[in-house]
Amino acid sequence: MALIMEPVSKWSPSQVVDWMKGLDDCLQQYIKNFEREKISGDQLLRITHQELEDLGVSRIGHQELILEAVDLLCALNYGLETENLKTLSHKLNASAKNLQNFITGRRRSGHYDGRTSRKLPNDFLTSVVDLIGAAKSLLAWLDRSPFAAVTDYSVTRNNVIQLCLELTTIVQQDCTVYETENKILHVCKTLSGVCDHIISLSSDPLVSQSAHLEVIQLANIKPSEGLGMYIKSTYDGLHVITGTTENSPADRCKKIHAGDEVIQVNHQTVVGWQLKNLVNALREDPSGVILTLKKRPQSMLTSAPALLKNMRWKPLALQPLIPRSPTSSVATPSSTISTPTKRDSSALQDLYIPPPPAEPYIPRDEKGNLPCEDLRGHMVGKPVHKGSESPNSFLDQEYRKRFNIVEEDTVLYCYEYEKGRSSSQGRRESTPTYGKLRPISMPVEYNWVGDYEDPNKMKRDSRRENSLLRYMSNEKIAQEEYMFQRNSKKDTGKKSKKKGDKSNSPTHYSLLPSLQMDALRQDIMGTPVPETTLYHTFQQSSLQHKSKKKNKGPIAGKSKRRISCKDLGRGDCEGWLWKKKDAKSYFSQKWKKYWFVLKDASLYWYINEEDEKAEGFISLPEFKIDRASECRKKYAFKACHPKIKSFYFAAEHLDDMNRWLNRINMLTAGYAERERIKQEQDYWSESDKEEADTPSTPKQDSPPPPYDTYPRPPSMSCASPYVEAKHSRLSSTETSQSQSSHEEFRQEVTGSSAVSPIRKTASQRRSWQDLIETPLTSSGLHYLQTLPLEDSVFSDSAAISPEHRRQSTLPTQKCHLQDHYGPYPLAESERMQVLNGNGGKPRSFTLPRDSGFNHCCLNAPVSACDPQDDVQPPEVEEEEEEEEEEGEAAGENIGEKSESREEKLGDSLQDLYRALEQASLSPLGEHRISTKMEYKLSFIKRCNDPVMNEKLHRLRILKSTLKAREGEVAIIDKVLDNPDLTSKEFQQWKQMYLDLFLDICQNTTSNDPLSISSEVDVITSSLAHTHSYIETHV
């Protein structure tokens, strides 16, 4: 180290001053004080808060900025030669065990009281901060090349981050000290296990090698060329190179690689500096620059190994076979990995990084204009990039006003490979890729050119932003479907077969070699690629507002489930697993065994290994994978999505479950962000042919079913921005959602041939998330469509006037559903009596538990029940008594109605059980105790008029609030009216009613919301800073 750079401890006061000039702007005011006191390098490394206070740095924030930069110098000065992944793991392991010992020692003391819920002591929080600091040092290594490209280390990094975030959440939870300590002990034991795993891999040279410094000189730099480096700066002042431009000075020297850390520029230490000051230092000498780089260990002892020599690697087909390190075989059983060669294909695909563009940054003249050649390119219509105007780039801030480039509006260029490219042409030297702009800030982990862009995809992308769910299951229609729907389904089935002919292979192209992607493109497109390279440009911000036309084509209609298990090939992980089925019947089997195949971040399941079609699949990057502790079945895990649904799986043994979780996390680590951008396939698809029964209430241990079967008119199928009908290719933007008209609704009701029966089936299915996110009516309450569509489909629209149809559930369709079903009985009671003059009675407007029971009672006279006549639970609280009074007031406005209800019971045991459940009776005929949800629904059932319901609801709120305030006033009057009040009595009263006293103080004093902050928020923000950075190109 002494031969390369002078140790920081040997710095003179002038060198300390020179280093401080590159720190944050707010610290420049203190340079004179440091210069006056002649602070040397050794004093700088040992400086404390008190010494900074003596130097005039009084603000805590400024002190922290200086100390953070000094910590980086300490790590450079003392830990460079000894710091490696193994020692960092030892430090984290020691911190975790120290925290465990601290908790154990506290419990052994005689003054320990674990039942209290007071805040944790400062020494406890200090140990937590030390633990997270040790974790950050380890993450700084795992988050960079070459460790970031190895799946085993990537999974370890994600686990450490998750545990640290969990630790920060635990210390700020409101629970007893004993419970908090137990949770922290569990996290510490898990962290120790992770560290032991890393330490056990001591045979891997990546674990035991230390970082080293290397001096690189770049000369003969043209003024218009630049250095050709992409530099990422973390929040605390570490500058990491993320890539180089091809044929640039940085690329030609063959010594600068992704993951290198810039330590010095022209022998001036820049650790802790601002990015703009680093850029100015690089531009200081136009003829050349001398860089001192800190290089991470590679797979060999040299600083430029073959596999990681440069980030523009050759395609995998041209690379020599290199023996894998033992780390990958530890976490991945060989029996579950596809092994066409001796190396792990999935790991090499994660390591593969395609060539970056040659000129992502075009220097402009002093006026900010592009060169003349580029202007000529614009004149002839060539796709010319705008340079490296990354939203994170400091260098481009002065030009942002001219081009208005923000993160959403960044123009991306995608290109297709030339036809008939041979293997020799795939090399970087012979095929320079000029004119391509890397996405935003060039993340080195992902393939930025490898995705096939279909021309029709541009039209489909506008839908993708607003419709999360693309549901494409080819489920069978229930036998209650009408004949014209069956006939239409046959025609649709023939078309779907033609569309699915070409979907016999997975359609994930990210992180694939260029030659393989070329072959896949030619196989799928079936048309010759033009001789010249094709360019497609699109803007991300315009995806939400562009095409609204219906898209057609073979790619748009294909389903990923139409691939046999044999054609899918050997997956990255496969085996038998249990899958939890949606509870469609009370007595149905909840779990079923399937053959699962994990392939390219997608999970397929088949009935057996020879099945010709997958029963379902999930695109895993869109789902969160975790243990399913809420299920009673052993070794269960789940794939959940907050907007779609959750899938539950279970393995036979604990090892199998861990193997599946590890493999899924490994494969989805590199896919997550990319799949979120390019997701043109479906998130999931599943066959429902074995479950055509009506749904029933699931057991207590199972989560709520993902959808219900309440029928609704077709116009409601796109009401939610998150749900789209099956096989529907119509746009789901806000504009198209609001364009439904009364004529279209009448046309759908009368059975127009243009309406797809599959869409009608999908319109009868609503997810629980859809129910939650259903827009409110003008009165603020949810009113759900509950009547079967069959009545409306076969009713004579001419015989019943639109005034007799039921009112709406959603604001955008209120007039349509009101015309279809008739008005409320409160406003149109006489007309309803004329309409039902044959002895029939108005419909019930309460929400049924199951629409399948309506099918059974389809031919029975439909009656309207008074909402007050439902079986009500006993009122045991004053709040329920208020509801009863309000319900009686509502009954006076509604008027007299018939109390009889005539329903024809179904023949099946299930329908009988559902009828008993609706009547709040047990199977033995005894009254069943109502649940909290039924208590809540009982109030909504009081009145069918939403306006009246809103008034009653508001009255109930006001009464409850008034009663609570009266009680508080009585408590306050008890103190104020006491003429003999003493200080002791007042202190006792204040302790007894502490919450009330704090409310009074809070209302009398104005609080600044910015002043309310938690101590642990600092810990969370410091951990989050590990991943916050800005990036530029020089």
Swiss-Prot record:
Looking at the record, the residues that make up the PDZ domain are: 215-297
Task: PTM Phosphotyrosine: list the residues.
Answer: 683
Q: Which InterPro entries does the record associate with it?
A: CNK1-3_SAM, CNK2/3_dom, CNKSR, CRIC_domain, PDZ, PDZ_sf, PH-like_dom_sf, PH_domain
According to its UniProt entry, one GO biological process term is: postsynaptic specialization organization
The PH domain is annotated at: 570-669
Please list the residue ranges that the record marks as compositionally biased, kind Pro residues: 701-714
| Start-end of Basic and acidic residues biased regions | 894-905
Q: Identify the main location.
A: cytoplasm
Q: Which segments show compositional bias classed as Low complexity?
A: 324-340, 730-740
Q: How does it sit in the membrane?
A: Peripheral membrane protein
Q: In the record, which positions carry Phosphoserine?
A: 12, 338, 390, 685, 687, 756, 767, 908
From the UniProt entry, list the residue stretches annotated as the region Disordered. Answer: 324-349, 480-510, 539-559, 682-766, 864-905
The SAM domain covers 11-76
Which SUPFAM superfamilies does the entry link to?
A: PDZ domain-like, PH domain-like, SAM/Pointed domain
Q: Which PANTHER family match?
A: CONNECTOR ENCHANCER OF KINASE SUPPRESSOR OF RAS (PTHR12844), CONNECTOR ENHANCER OF KINASE SUPPRESSOR OF RAS 2 (PTHR12844:SF21)
The similarity comment for this entry is: Belongs to the CNKSR family.
Q: What does this protein do?
A: May function as an adapter protein or regulator of Ras signaling pathways.
Subunit structure, as described in the record = Interacts with RAF1, RAB2L and RAL GTPase proteins.
Can you name this protein?
A: Connector enhancer of kinase suppressor of ras 2
Organism, as annotated: Homo sapiens (Human)
